[in-house]
Amino acid sequence: MKVIHLKKPAGLENLVLAEQETREPGEGEITVRVKASSLNYHDYVVAIGGIPCEENRIPMSDGAGIIEAVGPGVAGFSTGEQVIGCFFPNWQDGGPQPHKMIGVPGDNVNGFAAEYVTMPATGFTRTPSSYTFAQSSTLACAALTAWRGLM
């Protein structure tokens, strides 16, 4: 599959198109064919090195797509369903706490600048049925930003 890697040192000139094997989902994971990804200021800050990440990180925190494969132990998701990634996939409930804020796609873990992503199923939610993939891909970071502004 095609992916974009961020090489070191970080910088827009060091975003590189590459080929990488698609990983099969393991326990509790799903594989999603990415149909759309949206660019946020957060993604720009990662790309220029303002948020440090590992060499060859796949950027982009937000994405939408179709479930292609479901790993063992996954309940509540099926192949063919449309989903979006969650900005804080480890924050399932309750108030914000530091340990829930890790795992952000595109900086703590690989993100959505790829044809396929394999991630824990808990890091996804279904898309609104009336939204296009492009519309759905904008929800995670933007909705969280709006929520933070209200809180």
Language model region names:
Residues 1-2:
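Extreme N-terminal starter segment of soluble prokaryotic enzymes
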Residues 10-17, 41-43:
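Short N-terminal binding/cap micro-motifs at the start of the first secondary-structure element
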Residues 17-22, 64-66, 116-118, 124:
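Conserved hydrophobic/aromatic beta-strand scaffold that supports enzyme active sites
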Residues 21-22, 55-61, 104-109, 114-115:
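Short Gly/Pro-enriched turn/cap motifs at secondary-structure boundaries
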Residues 22-37, 47-92, 128-131:
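Glycine-rich beta-strand-centered segment in the early N-terminal region that forms part
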Residues 37-39, 72, 122, 144:
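Alpha-helix/helix-capping structural signal
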Residues 87-151:
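NAD(P)H dinucleotide-binding glycine-rich loop of Rossmann-like/cofactor-binding domains
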